UniProtKB/Swiss-Prot annotation:
Protein name according to UniProt: Ribose-5-phosphate isomerase A
EC class name: isomerase
GO cellular component: cytosol
Active site: residue positions: 101
HAMAP family with a match to the protein in the record: Rib_5P_isom_A
A GO term for molecular function: ribose-5-phosphate isomerase activity
Gene encoding the protein: rpiA
Pathway: Carbohydrate degradation; pentose phosphate pathway; D-ribose 5-phosphate from D-ribulose 5-phosphate (non-oxidative stage): step 1/1
SUPFAM superfamilies from the UniProt entry: D-ribose-5-phosphate isomerase (RpiA), lid domain (SSF75445), NagB/RpiA/CoA transferase-like (SSF100950)
Keywords of the record: Isomerase
UniProt record similarity statement: Belongs to the ribose 5-phosphate isomerase family.
Amino acid sequence: MSEAKRLAAEKAIDYVEDGMIVGVGTGSTVAYFIDALGHIGHRIKGAVSSSEQSTARLRQHGIEVLDLNHTGNLSLYVDGADECDPNRCLIKGGGAALTREKIIAEASERFICIVDPSKQVPVLGKFPLPVEVIPMARSLVARQILALTGGQPVWRDGVVTDNGNVVLDVHNLQITDPVALERSLNQIPGVVCVGLFARRPADVVIVGGEPPRVL
């Protein structure tokens, strides 16, 4: 699948225009995108990064990393996904960067999602749904998620997000209405961010292959 990831990432470079500030996500597919972006780094103003991991890789390529508070809205955001449904709704957060990813997606005019074919699903939920939670609310949120969804929340032990929070992964879901579930989970006190990108789905999904498919 690494070749499919690389092909999807390189296709996303087609959407990068001269003088842009590019929003950059996190994960193994995005790493290929950052490497490809490095070849045209002289053409862009810089990048806004969703994680310390991506920031380090961008800087290795000599790309300036900028603060979203100083850039205003972005023209383009490129990120991967753990699952993608036919409506371009996504599960994200396997790398625990979901909150910053969602912030950058919201600030961007266009969200390009790059995936390998294994990430395409008819219904979201086989991949456990990440939920970023304030540490003191972990047990409370887990109980409320169980009551609300019937899914099984599991604490991702040992993982602390770049924001200093913890992650619950919710197993055994079949998400037939992602927008409604995203809204409901966001109402639970202590929830920082839900790894459903449904209210703001991807605008374009690029599926790696020979040739890549654009959805």
